[in-house]
Each structure stands twice: as structure tokens, then as C-alpha cells.
Regions:
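Residue-level detector of beta-propeller blades
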Residues: 7-8, 106
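Acidic, metal-coordinating catalytic segment for phosphate/diphosphate chemistry
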Residues: 11-46, 51-52
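Charged phosphate-binding loop/patch that engages nucleotide di/tri-phosphates or the phosphate backbone
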Residues: 166-179
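Hydrophobic residues on conserved beta-strands that form the core of alpha/beta folds
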Residues: 21-23, 35, 59, 73, ...
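Short glycine/serine/proline-enriched coil/turn segments at secondary-structure junctions
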Residues: 16, 65, 113-116
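Conserved Nudix-box catalytic region and its N-terminal flanking loop in Nudix hydrolases
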Residues: 2, 46, 51-91
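Short loop segments at secondary-structure junctions
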Residues: 29-30, 51-53, 62, 126-131, ...
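Unchanged
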Residues: 34, 43-46, 77-164
Length: 179
């Protein structure tokens, strides 16, 4: 069974600082055409940083699209499509929390919204942490703190953590440690 679509035309209709929006015409498997709107994004990283006492570094920050403060794992965007995700993860952990790590484990890639964006989020676990100084971007305001991993698993079960990348990062890291 053929399920693939083929791009026939493509035009950029918005070119922003973080995203580009394009409108494509696609040939469908049944021979008809359809319009596809695609948000292009460089991608991002998410870090489940665990202390020696199995606490997770967590951040609180205001998320403008939702109009509220959310709790998340440290995360950020790739500066370019070809940036090494591990290097971006190290940078984001350092910027947002001040911490660096000696041990990094790749936990996988997450496609947050497969229907209309090509964004990928690379998820890492960081261990053997060393505390340093936060270096937030000038337009970034957040607070970081430590939370026991067991309580985060309960928070996910009870719908207290709505962010998908954070849920996935916590659950993948917890699985490695038998939680």
C-alpha cells in the first residue's frame, strides 16, 4: 500500500527568527492534490539532569503561547539545523541552570507535532553534575530547582506536567534507574 505524498510546489509565506512557514502542494497516493502548511524549525534539545541523590534539575518559566508559568526540564533550540544536539544540550543546561555534567546519555528523539512541523527534540540525560553560574539569554527569565524523580513521576501520572518533552525525558531517565 502506497502511503507517501510527493511535494509538487513549495512557497515560503513567513520567515521569522525561530520558525519558517511554507505552503506546499502535495500529490496524494490517490492522485489528488492537497495543500500542506509546514512549520520549519531547527529543532531543540531537552536535558534530564539528575543529581547524585536522584533529584532532577527543573525549571519554571512563563510560556507566552499558553499565558502561564510551566515547569519543564532544561531545554532550548538548536542554533542552526546542523548544530550537534549534544553540544546544544550542554549549552542549554549550563545557560539555564549553571550546571555542567561529566556523563551524557542520549535518550532518543521526539517529534512533538508530526502533522505540521519538522521540529525534532533530542533528549539527553546528564549525570555527574558540577554546579556553576547561570548564563540566561537576555530575553530569558526562569527559576531552576531540584525535584526528586519519584515525585515527578507522580506529577506526570496526575497531569501536573503538561509538557510532552519533559514527560518523555523524565520517564526515559526514570526507566534507566528502575523507577
Amino acid at each position: 500500500m502506497n502511503l507517501e505524498e510527493k511535494q509538487l510546489t513549495s512557497e515560503y509565506i513567513y520567515n521569522g527568527k525561530i520558525i519558517k512557514l511554507r505552503r506546499d502542494t502535495a500529490l496524494l497516493p490517490n492522485g489528488k492534490t492537497s495543500t500542506r502548511e509546514v512549520i520549519e524549525h531547527n529543532g531543540g534539545v531537552c536535558v534530564a539532569a539528575l543529581t547524585d541523590s536522584d533529584e532532577v534539575l527543573f525549571v519554571k518559566q512563563f510560556r507566552y503561547p499558553f499565558g502561564k508559568i510551566l515547569t519543564e526540564l532544561p531545554a532550548g533550540k538548536l542554533d542552526s539545523p546542523d548544530e550537534d544536539p549534544l553540544e546544544a544540550a550542554k549549552r542549554e543546561l549550563k545557560e539555564e541552570t549553571g550546571y555542567s555534567a561529566d556523563t551524557w546519555t542520549y535518550l532518543g528523539v521526539y517529534y512533538p507535532t508530526v502533522a505540521y512541523t519538522d521540529e525534532k527534540i533530542y533528549i539527553y540525560m546528564a549525570r555527574d553534575l558540577h554546579r556553576g553560574t547561570q548564563h540566561l539569554d537576555e530575553d530569558e527569565f526562569l527559576h531552576f530547582y531540584n525535584v526528586p524523580i519519584e515525585s515527578l513521576i507522580e506529577d506526570i501520572k496526575n497531569d501536573k506536567i503538561p509538557d510532552g518533552k519533559t514527560q518523555l525525558g523524565i520517564l526515559k531517565a526514570a526507566r534507566l534507574f528502575g523507577y
